[in-house]
Amino acid sequence: MSDKAAAPKKQGRNNGAVVLMCLSFVFGMGAMSYAAVPLYRIFCQVTGYNGTTQRVEQMSSVVLDRKMRVTFDANVAPGLQWDFKPVEREVNPRIGETIQVKFTAENRSNETQRGQAVFNVTPGEAGVYFNKVQCFCFTETDLKPGEKLEMPVVFYIDPEIVNAVESKDIHTVTLSYTFYPKEGPKPLASNEGGAEKVEKKL
């Protein structure tokens, strides 16, 4: 009788352990999924993988005679009624030369909207050598109805691009931006990325 009574208790403990293991697995997978995006972003920023550009705080001390053609692409994801485009479609700086270009963004909706620009460089091998000193993509951007901003990007191409086997034959790179809608409170941070107000339509 004692053995029969102990069997259900043992089975209950085993079932409890199985449930605990399953819950631990589910929570563990959830935590890994949550961490995967920021970890992947950090990996791309460090390695330049997938055309992710580098953020730097100082300019290049070496400027080569060779030039690099840089073209620009601007896109807006669904959810933002913005007109977003580069002021110049392409530039031809010397490799290592620090240069500033500008994009404009105009809110064509009747409400304040917030956006975050996501960027990449093609071909992907050039991403690690594309260094940004200043960029509106470093912060979120708020635009009031009818408001238009002029947003600078300061960058240079690392001279090491001509020495690397995978990138030495690259002569044209494309810097591409896509603005995505961003939810949240509306701080006074529109100009933190260097944006300048151009006009406000009443």
Swiss-Prot record:
Membrane-side (Periplasmic) residue stretches: 37-202
Domain of life: Bacteria
GO BP annotations, alphabetical order: respiratory chain complex IV assembly
Gene Ontology MF, one: copper ion binding
TM segment ranges: 14-36
Cytoplasmic side of membrane: 1-13
UniProt keyword annotations, A-Z: Cell inner membrane, Cell membrane, Copper, Membrane, Signal-anchor, Transmembrane, Transmembrane helix
Region annotation (Disordered) ranges: 183-202
Coiled coil regions in record: none
InterPro entries: CtaG/Cox11_dom_sf (IPR023471), Cyt_c_oxidase_assmbl_CtaG (IPR007533)
Keyword DNA repair: no
Membrane association type: Single-pass type II membrane protein
Membership in a protein family: Belongs to the COX11/CtaG family.
Function summary: Exerts its effect at some terminal stage of cytochrome c oxidase synthesis, probably by being involved in the insertion of the copper B into subunit I.
Protein name as annotated: Cytochrome c oxidase assembly protein CtaG
Organism: Rhizobium etli (strain CIAT 652)
Lineage per the UniProt record: Bacteria, Pseudomonadati, Pseudomonadota, Alphaproteobacteria, Hyphomicrobiales
